[in-house]
C-alpha cells in the first residue's frame, strides 16, 4: 500500500487560523455578496488543491541524449577532400543502422543538442576508416561531445597509396578542425577553446604530432635494419622510393595550438620520439598500451613515448589486450571480413573492455577540456 501524502491539514491550528481569517474579512467590511466566510474557506481549499496538483503531477524527464550522425567532406587545399563522419549529441530517437559491416545505434540527421560543446577529432590507424572507432565516438557524443572522425587520404581501407607518409596526417586534423569551426552546419554549438584529439596506432602518432611532438625521422632506417619484421618497417619497405628517400621527403608538421588534449593509444613510430622531442608538450595526455600488442611490440613503441612525455601522465595498460582491441567491437560480418582486426587473446572480452575504455576516454576529456 502506497503511503498517503496529506496536503490538507485539519488540526486545531488550521481551524483557528481559518476562523481568524474569516473574522478579519467580516470586520473589514469585505463580507459583501458572495464574499462570505464560507467562500473564503472554499477559496483556501481550492488553492491547496492547486498546490497539491502541482506537487503530485509527474515531472517531465529530460530527453535522453543519443548520438546524431552525418557525413561530410572537408577541403584539404589542392588535395582531394577529406571524408569525415560526424557524431554529436541529439535528443532525436536513435535507430540501429547498418553502415557497411558495422551496426550503429544513431539518429541520422537529428538536431544538435547543447551549446558550448567540446570537439574531438578521431584519427584512425593505418588502413582504417571513419567508423573504426565508432563505439568510442558514440560514447563521446552521448556524453555531450561533437566528434569528427576523418579518413586519412592515402592511408585508409580503400586507398593505401600513402600509407607510410605520416606527415600528411596532422594536416588532415587541422583541416577538419577548420571545417567544423567555420563550415559545419552545427558550428555555432561548438566551443572553439575545447578541442581534443583521439588517435590509435598511426593515429596516435598523429595526435602526438598535432600537439607539438617532433619525431626524429632519422631513427627509422637504423631501427628497421635491426627489426625489419616490425609492421611499420614492412610498410616502409614497400615504398618504391626506399626508406631514405621517403624520410627525406617528410616535413615536420606544425603544432595546432587549438588542440588542448589528446588520447594516445598504441602509438606507431614511438621509437622516433625522445624526451627532447616530447618534453615541450604542454597539454594533458592519456596514453594507452595493450599488454599483448604484437603489431607494435614493447619496448619500442609505447615505452619511449611514456618515458619522454611530461609528468604527471595518465597512463593506462590493458592486461591481455592486443593492438586491435582498441578498435570498436566487431559484428559477425566484419569479423568474417577482417579476422586479424577482430581476433582477441583467449579470455579477453572486447565488449566489456570498451565499456571501461570509453568511460575513461570520456572522463579524461571532460576534465582536460573543462570550460
Residues of each region from the PLM?
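Domain-level recognition of soluble alpha/beta enzyme cores
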Residues: 62-122, 314
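Short substrate-entry loop that stabilizes the transition state in hydrolases
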Residues: 109-117, 122, 126-158, 294-297
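Alpha/beta-hydrolase active-site loop
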Residues: 163-188, 209, 221, 225-232, ...
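Short glycine-enriched nucleophile-adjacent loop
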Residues: 181, 204-216
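Alpha/beta-hydrolase fold nucleophile elbow
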Residues: 188-199
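Acidic catalytic loop of the alpha/beta-hydrolase fold
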Residues: 270-271, 292-296, 324
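Short beta-strand/loop motif that positions the catalytic acidic residue
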Residues: 281, 287-289
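Short alpha-helix in the alpha/beta-hydrolase fold that links the catalytic acid
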Residues: 297-306, 330
Amino acid at each position: 500500500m502506497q503511503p498517503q501524502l496529506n496536503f490538507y491539514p485539519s488540526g486545531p491550528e488550521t481551524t483557528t487560523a481559518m476562523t481568524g481569517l474569516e473574522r478579519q474579512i467580516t470586520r473589514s467590511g469585505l463580507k459583501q455578496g458572495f464574499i462570505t466566510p464560507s467562500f473564503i474557506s472554499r477559496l483556501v481549499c481550492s488553492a491547496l488543491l492547486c498546490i497539491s496538483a502541482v506537487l503530485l503531477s509527474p515531472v517531465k524527464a529530460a530527453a535522453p541524449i543519443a548520438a546524431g550522425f552525418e557525413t561530410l567532406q572537408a577541403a584539404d587545399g589542392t588535395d582531394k577532400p577529406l571524408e569525415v563522419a560526424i557524431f554529436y549529441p541529439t535528443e532525436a530517437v536513435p535507430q540501429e543502422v547498418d553502415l557497411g559491416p558495422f551496426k550503429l545505434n544513431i539518429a541520422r540527421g537529428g538536431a544538435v543538442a547543447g551549446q558550448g560543446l567540446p570537439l574531438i577529432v578521431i584519427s584512425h590507424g593505418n588502413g582504417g576508416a571513419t567508423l573504426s572507432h565508432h563505439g568510442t565516438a558514440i560514447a563521446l557524443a552521448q556524453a555531450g561531445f561533437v566528434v569528427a572522425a576523418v579518413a586519412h587520404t592515402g592511408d585508409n581501407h580503400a586507398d593505401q597509396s600513402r600509407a607510410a607518409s605520416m606527415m600528411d596526417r596532422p594536416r588532415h586534423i587541422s583541416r577538419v578542425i577548420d571545417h567544423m569551426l567555420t563550415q559545419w552546419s552545427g558550428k555555432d554549438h561548438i566551443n572553439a577553446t575545447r578541442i581534443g584529439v583521439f588517435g590509435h596506432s598511426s593515429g596516435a602518432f598523429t595526435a602526438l604530432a598535432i600537439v607539438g611532438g617532433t619525431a626524429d625521422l632519422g631513427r627509422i632506417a637504423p631501427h628497421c635494419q635491426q627489426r625489419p619484421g616490425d609492421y611499420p618497417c614492412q610498410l616502409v619497405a614497400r615504398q618504391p622510393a626506399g626508406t631514405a628517400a621517403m624520410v627525406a621527403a617528410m616535413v615536420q608538421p606544425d603544432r595546432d595550438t587549438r588542440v588542448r588534449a589528446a588520447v594516445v593509444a598504441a602509438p606507431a613510430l614511438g621509437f622516433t620520439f625522445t624526451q627532447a622531442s616530447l618534453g615541450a608538450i604542454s597539454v594533458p595526455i592519456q596514453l594507452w598500451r595493450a599488454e599483448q600488442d604484437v603489431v607494435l611490440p614493447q619496448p619500442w613503441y609505447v615505452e619511449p613515448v611514456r618515458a619522454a612525455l611530461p609528468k604527471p601522465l595518465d597512463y593506462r595498460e590493458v592486461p591481455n589486450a592486443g593492438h586491435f582491441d582498441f578498435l570498436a567491437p566487431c559484428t559477425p560480418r566484419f569479423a568474417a571480413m577482417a579476422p586479424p582486426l577482430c581476433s582477441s587473446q583467449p579470455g579477453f572480452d572486447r565488449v566489456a573492455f570498451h565499456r571501461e575504455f570509453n568511460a575513461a576516454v570520456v572522463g579524461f576529456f571532460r576534465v582536460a577540456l573543462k570550460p
